[in-house]
Amino acid sequence: VYDRAMPIAIDDKCEVFEAPDTDKIKTSYKHLEGLFEKSSEEHPVSEENLEKIAQLDRYVIDHFRLAFGNRIVKQLKEFVPAFIDCGGDEVAGIDYLIAHKILRKFEQLNLAYIKDEIDGLVNYLEKLFGTGKTPECKAYLLRLKKTI
Protein backbone atom coordinates (compact mmCIF):
# COMPACT_ATOMS: atom_id res chain seq x y z
CA VAL A 1 0.00 0.00 0.00
CA TYR A 2 1.49 3.34 -1.06
CA ASP A 3 0.79 5.24 2.15
CA ARG A 4 2.66 2.57 4.13
CA ALA A 5 5.71 2.65 1.88
CA MET A 6 8.71 4.81 2.64
CA PRO A 7 9.55 6.53 -0.63
CA ILE A 8 13.11 7.68 -1.19
CA ALA A 9 13.21 11.24 -2.47
CA ILE A 10 16.40 12.23 -4.24
CA ASP A 11 16.23 16.01 -4.21
CA ASP A 12 19.94 16.69 -4.69
CA LYS A 13 22.69 15.24 -6.79
CA CYS A 14 25.92 14.42 -5.01
CA GLU A 15 29.36 14.45 -6.55
CA VAL A 16 30.48 11.37 -8.46
CA PHE A 17 32.49 8.92 -6.36
CA GLU A 18 34.00 5.48 -6.71
CA ALA A 19 32.35 2.89 -4.52
CA PRO A 20 34.68 0.20 -3.22
CA ASP A 21 33.97 -3.41 -4.11
CA THR A 22 32.33 -5.12 -1.17
CA ASP A 23 31.43 -8.70 -0.49
CA LYS A 24 27.77 -9.55 -0.72
CA ILE A 25 25.95 -10.78 2.32
CA LYS A 26 22.89 -12.92 2.65
CA THR A 27 20.44 -12.32 5.43
CA SER A 28 17.14 -13.87 6.28
CA TYR A 29 13.93 -12.03 7.00
CA LYS A 30 14.06 -13.42 10.53
CA HIS A 31 17.52 -11.93 11.11
CA LEU A 32 16.48 -8.55 9.67
CA GLU A 33 13.32 -8.53 11.79
CA GLY A 34 15.50 -9.31 14.82
CA LEU A 35 17.69 -6.29 14.02
CA PHE A 36 14.61 -4.07 13.85
CA GLU A 37 13.38 -5.41 17.19
CA LYS A 38 16.81 -4.83 18.74
CA SER A 39 16.79 -1.24 17.43
CA SER A 40 13.37 -0.64 18.96
CA GLU A 41 14.57 -1.94 22.32
CA GLU A 42 17.87 -0.03 22.33
CA HIS A 43 16.71 3.25 20.79
CA PRO A 44 13.02 3.86 21.55
CA VAL A 45 11.63 7.27 20.67
CA SER A 46 11.89 9.40 23.81
CA GLU A 47 8.76 10.33 25.74
CA GLU A 48 9.74 13.98 25.26
CA ASN A 49 9.68 13.62 21.48
CA LEU A 50 6.47 11.57 21.54
CA GLU A 51 4.86 14.46 23.43
CA LYS A 52 6.22 16.92 20.85
CA ILE A 53 4.74 14.78 18.08
CA ALA A 54 1.38 14.79 19.90
CA GLN A 55 1.59 18.60 20.17
CA LEU A 56 2.43 18.82 16.46
CA ASP A 57 -0.54 16.57 15.67
CA ARG A 58 -2.85 18.92 17.59
CA TYR A 59 -1.35 21.94 15.79
CA VAL A 60 -1.85 20.34 12.36
CA ILE A 61 -5.44 19.38 13.25
CA ASP A 62 -6.21 22.93 14.43
CA HIS A 63 -4.58 24.73 11.50
CA PHE A 64 -4.92 22.29 8.58
CA ARG A 65 -7.76 19.94 9.63
CA LEU A 66 -5.47 16.97 9.07
CA ALA A 67 -4.54 14.29 11.64
CA PHE A 68 -1.55 11.95 11.68
CA GLY A 69 -3.40 8.82 12.70
CA ASN A 70 -2.24 5.96 14.87
CA ARG A 71 -0.59 4.10 11.99
CA ILE A 72 1.82 6.99 11.34
CA VAL A 73 2.77 7.17 15.02
CA LYS A 74 3.33 3.38 15.03
CA GLN A 75 5.52 3.70 11.94
CA LEU A 76 7.46 6.51 13.60
CA LYS A 77 8.12 4.32 16.65
CA GLU A 78 9.49 1.59 14.37
CA PHE A 79 11.35 3.76 11.85
CA VAL A 80 13.21 6.16 14.15
CA PRO A 81 15.05 3.44 16.15
CA ALA A 82 16.29 1.83 12.90
CA PHE A 83 17.28 5.30 11.62
CA ILE A 84 19.32 5.83 14.80
CA ASP A 85 20.98 2.41 14.43
CA CYS A 86 22.01 3.41 10.90
CA GLY A 87 23.87 6.43 12.29
CA GLY A 88 21.19 9.12 12.38
CA ASP A 89 19.82 10.92 15.38
CA GLU A 90 16.33 10.85 16.81
CA VAL A 91 15.13 14.29 15.72
CA ALA A 92 16.57 13.82 12.21
CA GLY A 93 14.59 10.57 11.90
CA ILE A 94 11.44 12.30 13.11
CA ASP A 95 12.06 15.16 10.66
CA TYR A 96 12.45 12.71 7.76
CA LEU A 97 9.30 10.78 8.61
CA ILE A 98 7.17 13.88 9.16
CA ALA A 99 8.35 15.43 5.88
CA HIS A 100 7.78 12.28 3.83
CA LYS A 101 4.70 10.75 5.45
CA ILE A 102 2.70 13.58 6.99
CA LEU A 103 3.46 16.81 5.17
CA ARG A 104 3.09 15.03 1.83
CA LYS A 105 -0.62 14.81 2.64
CA PHE A 106 -0.80 18.61 2.38
CA GLU A 107 -0.72 18.26 -1.41
CA GLN A 108 -4.25 16.86 -1.20
CA LEU A 109 -5.52 19.97 0.56
CA ASN A 110 -6.67 23.22 -1.01
CA LEU A 111 -3.24 24.83 -1.33
CA ALA A 112 -4.66 28.35 -1.50
CA TYR A 113 -6.34 27.70 1.86
CA ILE A 114 -3.16 26.56 3.62
CA LYS A 115 -0.73 29.10 2.10
CA ASP A 116 -1.07 31.55 4.99
CA GLU A 117 -0.55 28.77 7.55
CA ILE A 118 2.76 27.41 6.20
CA ASP A 119 5.05 29.99 7.81
CA GLY A 120 3.34 29.41 11.14
CA LEU A 121 3.97 25.67 10.87
CA VAL A 122 7.64 26.23 10.02
CA ASN A 123 7.98 28.47 13.09
CA TYR A 124 6.12 25.95 15.26
CA LEU A 125 8.43 23.12 14.17
CA GLU A 126 11.47 25.27 15.01
CA LYS A 127 10.00 26.14 18.42
CA LEU A 128 9.09 22.53 19.15
CA PHE A 129 12.24 20.70 17.99
CA GLY A 130 14.81 23.52 17.93
CA THR A 131 16.06 25.98 15.34
CA GLY A 132 17.47 24.18 12.31
CA LYS A 133 16.54 20.71 13.62
CA THR A 134 13.82 20.00 11.01
CA PRO A 135 15.45 20.94 7.68
CA GLU A 136 13.52 18.35 5.63
CA CYS A 137 10.16 19.62 6.89
CA LYS A 138 11.15 23.24 6.35
CA ALA A 139 12.45 22.62 2.82
CA TYR A 140 9.31 20.67 1.88
CA LEU A 141 6.97 23.35 3.25
CA LEU A 142 8.86 26.16 1.50
CA ARG A 143 8.78 24.21 -1.80
CA LEU A 144 5.06 23.66 -1.34
CA LYS A 145 4.53 27.35 -0.65
CA LYS A 146 6.32 28.27 -3.90
CA THR A 147 3.87 26.17 -5.91
CA ILE A 148 0.91 28.17 -4.66
Where are these regions (language model features)?
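C-terminal regulatory/interaction module of P-loop NTP-utilizing enzymes
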Residues: 1-148
